[in-house]
From Swiss-Prot:
Taxonomic lineage: Eukaryota, Metazoa, Chordata, Craniata, Vertebrata
InterPro entries linked to this entry: Ig-like_dom (IPR007110), Ig-like_dom_sf (IPR036179), Ig-like_fold (IPR013783), Ig_sub (IPR003599), Ig_V-set (IPR013106), Na_channel_b1/b3 (IPR027098)
Protein known as: Sodium channel regulatory subunit beta-3
Record text on subunit structure and interactions: A voltage-gated sodium (Nav) channel consists of an ion-conducting pore-forming alpha subunit functional on its own that is regulated by one or more beta subunits. Forms homodimers and homotrimers. SCN3B is non-covalently associated with alpha subunits and induces the formation of alpha subunit oligomers, including trimers. Interacts with SCN5A/Nav1.5; regulatory subunit of SCN5A/Nav1.5. Interacts with SCN7A/Nav2.1; probable regulatory subunit of SCN7A/Nav2.1. Interacts with SCN10A; regulatory subunit of SCN10A/Nav1.8.
Origin species: Rattus norvegicus
GO cellular component, one term: intracellular membrane-bounded organelle
Chief location: membrane
Segments traversing the membrane: 157-178
Length: 215
């Protein structure tokens, strides 16, 4: 039985790894919306297919709208990568997956003028025997570019919660130590009182307190 308990966690890890390799899971994770000037910025666009075994013709279009402006095409994927003429020319890099569920792009050397609204359009035409349905999904990414990296609010909250938890655990441990100390002290005092009471009994009473054994 102990050997089985040791092998069970290992078998679970192997099973999880096998499932992840054999049955990859697509998760539509939203993109980050803040970038730092001069750094690369990945614009994440994920459009999962409910039935991955079905073949589909996929077309991806990336649009950019500056503040107070109109949308214009900056990148297109149609039977291959195609970067169109735009202010982003030479600074866009394809960062998608082979199955075209992840169709993200990366903006290199981000500038302050790159702030604005990015639109990711994914058009799919599925190939069935009877019909060819068409599905289109859209992802909007409002990007804000700053000169310097600001402190992440999520990390600040996580750090504060970590310190609060640490203080709580310290207080709890301190209270448990006091409780255990008092419990042990009371047990020792009770033992000493019993010993003192026994010693205070006269020797005659001790002899009389012995119960005779019937023959």
């Amino acid at each position: 039985m102990p050997a089985f308990n040791r092998l069970l966690p290992l078998a679970s890890l192997v099973l999880i790894y096998w499932v992840r390799v054999c049955f990859p899971v697509c998760v539509e994770v939203p993109s980050e919306t803040e970038a730092v000037q001069g750094n690369p910025m990945k614009l994440r666009c994920i459009s999962c297919m409910k039935r991955e075994e079905v073949e589909a013709t996929t077309v991806v279009e990336w649009f950019y709208r500056p503040e107070g402006g109109k949308d214009f095409l900056i990148y297109e994927y149609r039977n291959g990568h195609q970067e169109v003429e735009s202010p982003f020319q030479g600074r866009l890099q394809w960062n998608g997956s082979k199955d075209l569920q992840d169709v993200s792009i990366t903006v290199l050397n981000v500038t302050l003028n790159d702030s604005g609204l990015y639109t990711c359009n994914v058009s799919r035409e599925f190939e069935f025997e009877a019909h060819r349905p068409f599905v289109k999904t859209t992802r909007l990414i409002p990007l804000r570019v700053t000169e310097e990296a600001g402190e992440d609010f999520t990390s600040v909250v996580s750090e504060i919660m970590m310190y609060i938890l640490l203080v709580f655990l310290t207080l709890w441990l301190f209270i448990e130590m006091i409780y255990c100390y008092r419990k042990v002290s009371k047990a020792e005092e009770a033992a000493q009182e019993n010993a003192s009471d026994y010693l205070a009994i006269p020797s005659e009473n001790k002899e009389n307190s012995v119960v005779p054994v019937e023959e």
